């Protein structure tokens, strides 16, 4: 009988007096009794002492719990030797007594032993049936609310599905619109390209044959003149008899020489490169551009909003610095251009001259002489009847632009100038591998009461504002 008694003693020693189950994380109080850590924590729920031992009722001024690891091993051994039997439904797992009450604070079912333990002494504990009736009433109200929410959810789901379907149709319609519109634009561009090439060919056939004919005729006249000059030079070397002999024919031929000068051909081309809708498309890359007063030449006068500049009659007393242009009559845009695509427009009006473009941040701003001859400057210069660039490419102008659009594609090394009035291409620089920081450059060149003004763009056709 010793073995069963030993087994029983092991079970009793490994059982918590509060939950009546094997110890879980046992701790020892100052009086030497052991409890599960969670059990004693719930039993001593009050924030301040004194705290009473659940077994001997000894009082302690403060919580002082020491882990009991040997007891934890003993409880684990007892659990393996005598695993707890399955708890029947309606019976407390801790005390093996019928569940007869319900704790409203912890939402737990309680037996009589749970109530006697003192763990729930300050809680709202009610008989099982009363608690069940109250909970059933609450659940029925919750069900009513949930059913209403479910109705709303189904309605919202139907609306969302309908919206999704409508959006899908809208996207598909818009996709077809995009495809149709761009196909139309492609056809329009092809037709416009063919029309421009045809006009160029017609202009070439109209202008070049007379020019070639005139050049050939002048070549024949030059050859006849050269032959006559050679004859006269030879006759001048002859003695008197040879010089005067048959002179009548020679003099007649000299008198018959009549040089026909070539016809004056206008150098302005009637056909210009103009792509429909290009300027409107470029305005997608618009950005706010303002002038940097710290870079302005002392002769330049800037507006208060830093969007307009003109060349004044007097030189202002401004502090000199490496950032300031002098003697070049220039000013830079404040915004650095380091990547991406950028487009801005400048109202130049009927100015006699101007210069626009970009330059490197570190370009020499104290250069004397030809400012725009390369050296980190990419500038288009207008000089009354024609324009040139730092690449030394000259091109006459039939109708000087009143507003100039500048488009920079940094990564592509592309810089182009357009007439924003009609979209015609003014000039494109050869592809350039840009590096470092670029800044927009503005120069009125000549004095005029009319300023150059950076336009405010909204992106649509004709949305650029006129000068303020």
UniProtKB/Swiss-Prot annotation:
Zn finger residue spans: B box-type: 87-128
Annotated positions of the Phosphoserine modification: 85
Extent of the signal sequence: none
Superkingdom of this protein's organism: Eukaryota
Molecular function, one GO term: zinc ion binding
GO biological process assignments: host-mediated suppression of symbiont invasion; innate immune response; negative regulation of AIM2 inflammasome complex assembly; negative regulation of viral transcription; protein ubiquitination; regulation of gene expression; suppression of viral release by host
PROSITE patterns assigned to the protein according to its UniProt record, in alphabetical order: B302_SPRY, ZF_BBOX, ZF_RING_1, ZF_RING_2
Homology family: Belongs to the TRIM/RBCC family.
Protein function: E3 ubiquitin-protein ligase that promotes the degradation of insoluble ubiquitinated proteins, including insoluble PAX6, poly-Gln repeat expanded HTT and poly-Ala repeat expanded ARX. Mediates PAX6 ubiquitination leading to proteasomal degradation, thereby modulating cortical neurogenesis. May also inhibit PAX6 transcriptional activity, possibly in part by preventing the binding of PAX6 to its consensus sequences. May contribute to the regulation of the intracellular level of HN (humanin) or HN-containing proteins through the proteasomal degradation pathway.
Protein's name according to its UniProt entry: E3 ubiquitin-protein ligase TRIM11
Underlying gene: TRIM11
